[in-house]
Amino acid sequence: MDAHAKVLEALRWQADVTNDPLTAGVLDAAHADVFMGGATWHRLRPHAHLPTGAALALRLAGAAHRLALAGDAPAYAAHLPTCGGDGDVEAARAAFVALMADDRLDLRPVQTNEPGRLAALLPAFAAVHERTGLPLRLLELGSSGGLLLRRPEGIPVVGRRGCDPNPLDPSNPADRLLLLSFVWAGDLPRFRRLEAALDAAVADPAAVDACDAGTWLGAQLRGRTPGVTTVVFHSIVWQYLPPTTRQHVDLALAKAARRADDEAALAYVRFEPGDGVAETRVTHWPGGDERLLATSGFHGQDVVLAPR
């Protein structure tokens, strides 16, 4: 597949699966402009080599949204609900394509921290605690700003720590802007929820280390930690990890699993894509048994608990 066809496919797929009409609309307009060889094609052509998992269309939408949120794209912002705009999809399409000639567009790697996913993760944390009776030590891969490293109500947590190759600081205005820019510009409730989660993380911060997930997890799981259940978790992260990092994560878990016992248990919780939905799965050690705990939307909405 040549570069032009690859970019067209990336935009078409993202526009089709995005359930925010405004974001779907501007990506559809971008697709049409790329097809015609317009400014959007010239903007994206240098990035056409990126793999599918790099989410090129979301990088583009986030870059435009970031300019609007910063006050640097008023014509586009006028139509974005997240910027107080009117939500006019047709007007947003035209303004988006016009913005493609702006050299301030910065197609950063997608970095999200969706607090709504806690709705699907909390049942897993509760199930792990119910099974072991031990307080939890939470270790998150791909933590971003650490917004999911909260203290679940009613579940004792004795440690919270995460890692990310590029951790973001919820108290830093530039980092807040980056996270907010990857929310769909027409989804105001989700945008407000993220703002509230950023404020909560500032009030009760969790440590997030700048490190490769495989290297970091190997170090975190090196010793036995009696009296707690160590919970390794991640949410919509696996697709972004390089193959070598995935192998190192699997190896670290396998080594720790061999040491796990009833006094120092281990659980692996993941919220990742399934068949058209997100699946929350947990594997417990000792034992190594795996369960599907819940399905939901990819932002943690519409959680359905699996039968026990």
Where is each model-derived feature located?
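A short, acidic, amphipathic alpha-helical segment used as a generic capping/interface helix at domain edges
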Residues: 211-224, 252-257
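A short SAM/SAH-binding and catalytic strip from SAM-dependent methyltransferases
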Residues: 230-243
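SAM/dcSAM-binding transferase cores
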Residues: 281-308
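Extended hydrophobic secondary-structure segments that form protein cores and membrane-embedded regions
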Residues: 137-141, 233-234, 267-272
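A short N-terminal interaction module
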Residues: 1-100, 104
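Class I S-adenosyl-L-methionine-dependent methyltransferase module
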Residues: 46, 50-55, 67-97, 108, ...
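Short, hydrophobic/aromatic alpha-helical segments in well-folded domains
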Residues: 120-124, 252
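C-terminal substrate-binding/active-site "lid" region of AdoMet-derived donor-dependent transferases
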Residues: 240-290
